[in-house]
């Protein structure tokens, strides 16, 4: 249920709303190259909310969609830098408030509100959200799937502080998930109803982040790494006690002006007493959410983007990962690998924001994705 700030911001670009007023269309034309561009529409729309369509294509929940209402808040400093340097990408991220609702073909749905704020020239970064939803998913015991539903309320507050103007941040996050899970055990016996249980899960995350990326949207250069430890405890308002630790790295480098290479790594581990939904799973394009879970998870991914023109690009990617069960050695766990490709269009030059479509082949199926910004969110 958690939404990251960049995903909410990126969703606004995917709308590409076109006004019927001929004069209003001028804000969608970039004076630099005469191409379609949404930078001005996103950054200069300072009055009222914007309706934004949401497209969902995750194989775990099926195809679906929804809508969001977003309001951008650009600081005076960021606006000044953008207007003084219209050909440059301003590194300071805008703030955004959103209200959204979405549903999919398998009956899953989500609604909620979110705010991302960046203050004092990006010294402080804040995220806060409240969401309610219901998800119909599959839980795998080995290769045997069991249908289940989880519905509930998710609340989160997240703050990061930049250390002395450097690329290092320290931060903390509080989250509370109040949920009900219902499992269909697969036996058509009237006297045995589906198994269900309620759970309150509250936790505090402590984290250290390094971020030198040139933009939060579609980076061409830079590194973002985050090291975090989560403490879930009854003292924070929950019913369960467990811990999680995670290390994530996304690195981007321009091999040439028109060729960008990205490398991603992700490692997660969780204590024995974690609830089923908190167990790490392999998260890559081509693999459904929660398909391969374990007590430990590690993955690596490589992506290349070639800019055919300044606006149009093609991408290719591959990756592999393992989900390791308790008591199982890393070497005994099977690799789960993906390969895929797609295309991108530079839809907002002043944000270096690219959108497009990806197709990926995983161990069991093909999957298709609408990609807004970069597929790797951290």
Regions found by a protein language model. Name each.
Residues 99-100, 141-146, 188-195, 231-237, ...:
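Extracellular loop and loop/strand-boundary signature of outer-membrane beta-barrel proteins
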Residues 18-21:
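N-terminal signal peptide c-region/cleavage motif recognized by signal peptidases
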Residues 204-320, 324-326:
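C-terminal outer-membrane beta-barrel translocator/porin domains of Gram-negative envelope proteins
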Residues 49, 65-67, 109-113, 151-157, ...:
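Hydrophobic, lipid-facing positions within transmembrane beta-strands of outer-membrane proteins
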Residues 42-49, 55-200, 353-354, 360-367, ...:
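Gram-negative/organellar outer-membrane beta-barrel architecture
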Residues 38, 48-57, 93-103, 111, ...:
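Transmembrane beta-strand segments that form the barrel wall of outer-membrane beta-barrel proteins
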């Amino acid at each position: 249920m958690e939404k990251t700030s960049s995903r909410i911001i990126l969703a606004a670009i995917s709308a590409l709303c076109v006004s019927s007023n001929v004069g209003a269309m001028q804000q969608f034309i970039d004076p630099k190259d005469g191409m379609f561009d949404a930078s001005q529409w996103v950054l200069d729309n300072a009055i009222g909310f914007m309706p934004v369509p949401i497209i969902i294509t995750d194989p775990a929940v099926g195809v679906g969609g929804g809508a969001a209402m977003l309001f951008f808040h650009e600081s005076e400093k960021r606006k000044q830098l953008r207007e003084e340097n219209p050909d440059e990408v301003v590194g300071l991220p805008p703030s955004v408030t959103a209200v959204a609702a979405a549903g999919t073909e398998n009956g899953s749905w989500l609604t909620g509100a979110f705010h991302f704020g960046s203050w004092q020239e990006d010294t402080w970064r804040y995220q806060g959200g409240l969401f309610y939803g219901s998800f119909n998913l599959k839980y795998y015991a080995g290769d045997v799937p069991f249908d289940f539903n989880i519905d509930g309320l998710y609340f989160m507050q997240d703050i990061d502080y930049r250390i002395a103007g450097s690329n290092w941040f320290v931060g903390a996050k509080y989250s509370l998930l109040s949920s009900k899970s219902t499992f269909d055990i697969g036996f058509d016996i009237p006297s045995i109803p589906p198994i269900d249980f309620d759970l309150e899960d509250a936790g505090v995350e402590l984290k250290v982040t390094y971020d030198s990326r040139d933009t939060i949207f579609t980076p061409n250069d830079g590194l973002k790494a985050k090291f975090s430890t989560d403490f879930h405890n009854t003292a924070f308002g929950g019913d369960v006690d467990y811990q999680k630790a995670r290390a994530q790295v996304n690195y981007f480098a321009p091999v040439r002006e028109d060729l960008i290479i990205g490398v991603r790594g992700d490692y997660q581990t969780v204590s024995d007493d974690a609830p089923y939904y908190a167990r790490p799973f392999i998260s890559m394009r081509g693999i459904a959410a929660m398909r391969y879970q374990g007590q430990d998870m590690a993955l690596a991914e490589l992506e290349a983007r070639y800019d055919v023109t300044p606006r149009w690009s093609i991408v290719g990617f591959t990756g592999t990962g393992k989900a390791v069960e308790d008591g199982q050695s890393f070497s005994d766990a099977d690799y789960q690998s993906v390969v895929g490709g797609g295309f991108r269009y530079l839809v907002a030059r002043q944000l270096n924001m690219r959108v497009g479509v990806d197709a990926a082949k995983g161990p069991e199926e093909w999957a298709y994705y609408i990609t807004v910004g970069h597929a790797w969110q951290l």
